[in-house]
Amino acid sequence: MVRDITECSSPNLFDPEDTILNNLSYHLLIGHGDPEMIKRECILLLKDLEALELDKIKSFVEESIIKDYVNEQILPSNKPGFQLSTWVGNFGEVLASQILIDSEGFWFPIYKLRYREKTSWAMKLTDLCLIKTNGLSKPLICYGEVKTKSSTCDIQLGIKGHDSLVRDDALQDPEILKFFCTVLYSAQKYEEGEFFSKLRLQIIDYDKEYRLFLIHEKSTWKEDVLSNLNSYELSSSLINFSVTVVLVEQLRKLIDESYSRAWKSVEGWIKNG
């Protein structure tokens, strides 16, 4: 199944209050790191500013410290020498998750990007793992691969995404499920941890589906991507496989602007305690 979700209402890149951009930047931040850790580490960095008496200077320095921390310690880099594909790809994973959550009722996205050893490294793990339980007789597990292209078109993109999804199926790797459980219990997310324990221990039945998201710059998209995938021999292991195409105008600018706003969420966490 192929669904074409073309952005009909583009966010305003110049509006600091744009809800679409601010929502994406928030989820980019929490997708890369634990909110409580981020907040506490920023508070530690800001302690030396308590003696400053000039509010304008203090506010400027606080903003600079938070921005530097988020950009250097949490988010991937888009500077020369680093993998730009990580910068672009991580955005795609977050956008795809939000589409599933907002439009289809999935919950609790597990992003592989949070568990990389380094922020600019790739990790061998399914891009997306989300759960849907409401209104279903059995839980539905969605595994997804996301391919994001913000520049030229690669007509083999769909085939590459399909092959990645076949390779990185978490349900076929008990160590990955155990890893999920360990992380969730350590974070005191007991409900979610118990759910994955039931999967790992084969206590509950569940349905599963596989999604391939192709997030692409609208101006360079070619239907050849889907034509090539349609003529490709698909793996029988991908149960309920579907493709979702998301075409976005000025995708690279949207990505960069979303990252640049991520620090604002930290500022709000600190002010609200």
Language-model region placement:
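Conserved catalytic cores of phosphodiester-cleaving nucleases, focusing on short active-site segments
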Residues: 100, 128-130, 142-148
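Non-catalytic C-terminal interaction segments of nucleic acid-processing enzymes
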Residues: 209-273
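Short, solvent-exposed loop/turn segments that connect beta-strands within catalytic domains
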Residues: 134-140
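A short, highly charged nucleic-acid-interacting micro-segment common to nuclease
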Residues: 75-97, 114-119
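Charged, often glycine-rich, active-site loop that binds/positions anionic groups
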Residues: 120-130
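Acidic, metal/cofactor-coordinating or nucleic-acid-engaging core segments within structured domains
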Residues: 152-223
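Nuclease-adjacent, charged terminal/linker segments that flank catalytic cores
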Residues: 1-67, 74-75, 254-273
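A short acidic/basic microdomain associated with nuclease active sites
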Residues: 103-121
